[in-house]
């Protein structure tokens, strides 16, 4: 099923309603030996339950700079039209609003031109947010801005990455208490990945590290969960051992072609309850999702993705509700 998203320049955000047992901001609530209790309201068990709250970054100060091999190529050949890119981001916002997702924002800062990619500066977990450690100097300020955002929202921090660089696009909750951690060296170093892995092992989670060439930037370029035991994977560029691991866990794989993947076609957002936001250019994935009965909202991301990321890169899930 295709979904048409109505554009409304006077969109109103869904009103945020918290339950009575709210959570309070603290800088670290992780218990060093494990056993950290899940938050009362915020967080999620997996990346496929119904999305109720999402964190986005503003595109107000977006610039097209050479942040990766992907953005470097488009900058050289066909630089992004920033006004069109910003309009496409508004279409993405409209999709979340259309599906009733409460949208929260980082505060816009002119010194942070890549702030629109809200996935990377933090990670949400059942236990609180993790402030990551960005690899590139021009993005490190996003970590400090993210800390302020969580303080403003009243969301506690689980911890902060200190052992090495680590970016949120490399934290992939495959299913309940199971995380796939990417390590491409260019953005997430093994030291940072091992630190985060150690935390979740102590919480009793199953963990798996995925090593890949830094060309692919983050693991969410090639592996993204769709629904319970249904995962989109680019088989052409994903380590076979990861695919075998997923299949052994009972996951059905939807293959995304390599050409689509390097154009961010596997970088989409599952909203849960059979709804998915997908880049318009990812036609093969859209067709295969519809064949599985999903409601697919296609958003044109052709200009904004030139700056280095896709739909999944632009969103940090803050809360998913398994009962919604």
What annotation goes with each model-predicted range?
Residues 2-324:
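The feature marks the mature, well-folded catalytic cores of soluble enzymes
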């Amino acid at each position: 099923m295709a979904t048409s998203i109505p554009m409304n320049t006077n969109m109103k955000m869904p009103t945020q309603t918290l339950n009575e047992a709210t959570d309070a901001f603290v800088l670290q609530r992780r218990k060093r030996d494990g056993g950290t209790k899940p938050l009362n309201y915020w967080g999620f068990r997996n990346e496929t339950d119904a999305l109720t709250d999402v964190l986005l970054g503003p595109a107000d100060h977006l610039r097209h700079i050479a942040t990766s091999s992907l953005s470097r190529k488009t900058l050289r050949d066909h630089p992004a039209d920033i006004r069109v890119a910003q309009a496409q981001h508004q279409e993405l916002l409209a999709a979340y609003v259309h599906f009733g997702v409460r949208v929260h924002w980082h505060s816009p800062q002119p010194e942070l031109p890549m702030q629109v990619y809200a996935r990377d500066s933090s990670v949400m977990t059942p236990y609180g947010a993790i402030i990551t450690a960005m690899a590139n100097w021009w993005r490190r300020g996003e970590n400090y801005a993210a800390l302020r955002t969580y303080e403003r929202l009243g969301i506690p921090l689980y911890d902060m990455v200190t052992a090495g660089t680590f970016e949120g696009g490399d934290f992939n909750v495959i299913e309940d208490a199971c995380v796939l951690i990417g390590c491409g060296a260019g953005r997430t170093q093994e030291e940072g990945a091992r630190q985060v892995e150690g935390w979740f092992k102590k919480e009793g989670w199953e963990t798996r590290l995925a090593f890949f060439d830094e060309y692919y930037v983050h693991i969410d370029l090639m592996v993204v969960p769709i629904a319970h035991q249904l995962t989109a994977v680019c088989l052409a560029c994903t380590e076979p051992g990861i695919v075998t691991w997923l299949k052994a866990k009972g996951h059905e794989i939807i293959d995304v072609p390599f050409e689509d993947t390097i154009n961010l076609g596997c970088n989409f957002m599952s909203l849960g309850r059979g709804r998915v936001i997908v880049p318009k250019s990812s036609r093969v994935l859209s067709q295969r999702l519809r064949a599985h009965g999903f409601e697919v909202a296609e958003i044109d991301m052709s200009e904004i993705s030139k700056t280095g990321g896709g739909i999944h890169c632009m969103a940090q899930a803050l809360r998913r509700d398994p009962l919604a």
